[in-house]
A protein has these predicted regions:
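Flexible, active-site-proximal loop/turn residues at the rims of small-molecule/cofactor binding pockets
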Residues: 236
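OB-fold (S1/OB) nucleic-acid-binding surfaces
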Residues: 186-214
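Generic detection of short hydrophobic beta-strand segments and adjacent strand-loop junctions
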Residues: 111, 214-216
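Broad gene-expression machinery/nucleic-acid interaction feature
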Residues: 129, 181, 201-203, 211, ...
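Short nucleic-acid-contacting surface segments enriched for D/E, G, S/T with interspersed K/R
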Residues: 217-233
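OB/S1-fold single-stranded nucleic-acid-binding modules
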Residues: 2-183, 239-265
Length: 265
């Protein structure tokens, strides 16, 4: 499945975790540290189990689906906002039709959705207010838009979702993932420290085909400067900005205008 299952590996190869300062060798180590932190909150009830979220003051998040198919996947408390029609592919992966305020489609992308397990059995959710964070896997920086255009031959407003292409092709030969390729301009950049681990990471606000947050491992490098271009590959995460109040059943899922379909959870 698209969610990152708890893995038992002996080496630090979880680049996506390191990009938000969760510098653990194993997913299980991250889960155990999150549980011990006393910063867990129940997002909602799912098929007799729970969807639990750990949120670090740095914005780093860990979502834990404590019922079959049991998944652990990262997220981030992003500052950028947008709108999308949201349709779940499985318990974790969502197909997003990212739209502008007039309803015009900007892009289609697949992302690991923080509330995904709550919506897995629900129909298409239209006009959802969402936040998007790209977790950098392999990126490079260009001094300016002109430098990017000179090197790549195109304007730096790229966002291509491999998972969305797989879904639109209708081919069952490939499994969609939240992987994406992007190029965008840096609007803001700052260093943050994950309190759970003490590890630093870079948090950027990006202006590209649509606005999104970008998190990168610190790596001892200088922060990308404002108006520089960052491009490369990433894992896309998303969160629905749900209205307060919820459904009154502890599900933690808002049912306001266009709500997120809390029935049956």
């Amino acid at each position: 499945m698209a969610g990152m299952n708890v893995k038992d590996t002996g080496v630090k190869q979880n680049t996506e975790m390191q990009a938000i300062g969760l510098n653990f060798e194993r997913w299980q180590d991250a889960v155990e540290a999150a549980i011990a932190s006393d910063r867990l909150a129940v997002t909602g009830e799912v098929r007799g189990g729970q969807l639990i979220q750990f949120t670090d003051p740095s914005g780093a998040q860990l979502n834990i689906l404590a019922v079959e198919p049991f998944a652990t996947f990262i997220g981030f408390n992003a500052v950028t906002q947008g709108f999308a029609h949201v349709e779940m592919v499985n318990d974790v992966l969502a197909l997003l039709e990212i739209i502008d305020p007039f309803g015009t489609t900007i892009a289609q992308a697949t992302a690991n959705l923080a509330q995904g397990p709550l919506l897995a059995d629900e129909p298409l959710q239209q006009w959802q207010q969402i936040s998007l964070t790209a977790v950098g896997l392999d990126v490079r920086t260009y001094e300016s838009a002109a430098a990017y255009e000179a090197a790549e031959g195109e304007f730096p407003a790229l966002f291509e979702s491999a998972g969305a292409k797989v879904i639109s092709s209708g081919s069952g030969a490939e499994v969609p993932t939240p992987a994406a390729t992007f190029a965008a301009r840096v609007m803001e950049s700052e260093s943050r420290t994950n309190e759970l681990t003490g590890e630093k990471f870079a948090h950027l606000v990006m202006d590209g085909l649509f606005p999104f947050d970008l998190c990168l491992p610190a790596g001892g490098n200088e922060l990308p400067a404002k108006d520089s271009i960052v491009a490369g590959t990433a894992l896309l995460t998303a969160s629905i900005e749900m209205p307060s109040g919820g459904c009154g059943d502890g599900a933690g899922c808002g049912c306001g205008s266009g709500g997120c379909g809390c029935g049956g959870h």
